[in-house]
Amino acid sequence: MKRALLINLPKTDLMVPPAALGVLAGVCGENNVDYDFLDFNVGLDSKFEDEQWLIMDNWLTGVTDSCDTEFLSVISRCWKESVIDNIHKYDFICISVLSYWGLKIAMHLLSNLDFVNNKRNYKIIIGGSGCQNNIDGYAQGKKSLGEWLLENMYVDHVVYGDGETTFAEILQESKQTLLKPTAQQDDLNSYPIPNYKGINFSDYKADAVFITGSRGCVRKCTFCDIETTWPVFRYRKAELIVEEIKKHYYDLGVERFEFTDSLINGSVSNFYKFNQLLAEEKAKNSDLKNISYVGQFIARPKQQMLPSHYEAMYYAGCKQITIGIESFSERVRNDMKKKFSNRDIDYHIKQCALWGISNIWLMIVGYPSESQEDHLDNIHGIKRYAPYAKTGVLEMIRWGTTLHYIDGTPLTRQHMLDRHQIYEPGNDSEIRPGSSYTWKSGINPDLTLRERIRRRLDLHKHTTKHRIPQARALEDLMILSRMAESA
C-alpha cells in the first residue's frame, strides 16, 4: 500500500488539529493510501519560547522583512529531523499552506535541495489557500506561490481551491501539475468525511475537531481574500453535517466542534435546519447532550435572523460565535461592504444575551477612509457594549494591530488603490508588494501609520477602562511597538 505524509505548515495555532490534515486523510482513506500526520507547528512548539513565536509571527505577517539566520537554522533543523530524515518511507509528501502567512516559511523549506533533489522517488504536493497568494516582494516576478514552486521544480503538483477531488486524482497518478477546480462545480455533499484518527489530541489545547458546513462567503468585504480561493458560496446539506458530528463523537469521543466556515449563517435557511436537526438528535439521544459548536457568524437584520433562529442555536449547543464587526462606525462598515447596520448589531447582541451565546468581535483599526469622527464612533461603541462584557455575552474584542494591505484582496485592486490614492512612503507611485502596514492615503493624509498606531492604543485604553477582555492584547501591543519603529 502506498503511503503519504500529511504536513501542516506554520503558522496555525495549537488549539485544534488542523482541518487540512483531516481532509487529506479522508481522501487518502477513500483511495487506499495509508498516511501519517505531521503538524510542523507542534514540532516547532517544542523548540520555541513565546518570544521566538512572536519573532516568527512578525516575519510571516510582514511586520519584519527578514528573519535571523540562527532562527531560520532552527526551523531548518526541525524540518530535517521530522521530514527529510524520514522521507524515504513515503510515496507522497502532501503540504498544506493555510494562508498568506505561510508563504515565507513554505519558500524557505521547500527550496531545501535535500528535500527537492531531482532523483526523488516521491511526489511533493502542495495545496491550501496560501498557494494562490502572490509572492511578489519575496521572489522575482509577480506570480503565485504555486506557480513559483512549479517553475523551480520544487514540487510536482499544486492544488488550488477545493482539494478533495484534485488530490484524489494525484493519488491515482494524475500527470497534471497545476490542478484547479472547474468553476467550483464539485458538490460539497459528495466529499469524503475528514478523518482525524491517528491525530495526537494531547498536542492541542482543546479537545475538539473542525467541521465544514460551507465554503466561500456571501459577502465581498474589501479587506478579505476568501473570494480568491472560493469565488462561489456553497454549503452542505444540514443532515450531512449532523451525521458527521455524530460520527466524530462516536469515533473520537469529541464533543466540541469548530466550524471552518467563513460564516455559519451564510445560508440562513440551511443553518436554521441544521440547528433544528442537531437539537432533535440531542433530545433523542442522551449520549449527545454535551455536543457543542462554535463558528464565525455575520450580524443580520431581524427579518433574516428571527428570534426563533437564536433559540434553535441555543438548543443545538452553540456556545460561541466570532463576528467581524470591524468598526463601530456604520460609514466605515459600508465602505468595507459589511452590509449590516448598528441596529442589526444591537438586535444580534440582545438575542445572544437572551440565549447565553457568547461573542468574540473582530475589529480593524485604520481603514483607509477612517476619520477622527469614525474613531470616536469606535470609542462610543466600546462604552455602548461594555454591559454585555460584564455578563460574558461579549466575551472579548480583538482589535488586532492596524489595517495592512494584502495582495489578493479587493483593496489591492487598482481601482481601489486609485480610489484611496494609496502609496508607499518613499515610493509615491506604488504600494509595497506583498503585505504593507506602512501605506499612506492621499485622500486621508492624516491617517499615517503613527496616527493608526495612536488610535489603536487609544482603543486599548478605553477597552481596558470598560473592562472588556481583549484577545491577544499583549501580542498585538508588542507587534505595534515593532511597527512604531517604522513610523
Question: Where are the language model's segments positioned?
Answer:
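Radical SAM enzyme core and accessory elements
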Residues: K2-L9, L14, V23, G29-E30, ...
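Acidic, low-complexity intrinsically disordered segments
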Residues: K2-G253
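Flexible glycine/acidic-rich beta-alpha junction loops that bind and position SAM and/or redox cofactors
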Residues: G43-F48, C131-D136, R219, V268-S269, ...
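Short helix-capping segments at alpha-helix termini
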Residues: N32-V33, D114-N121, A279-K289, P387-T391
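A structural motif corresponding to the C-terminal end of an alpha-helix
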Residues: N31-V33, M153-Y154, D251-L252, N285-D287, ...
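Structural recognition of alpha->loop->beta junctions
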Residues: G141-T166, A312-Q320, I379-G400
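Radical SAM [4Fe-4S] cluster-binding motif and immediate context
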Residues: S190-N359, Y367, H380
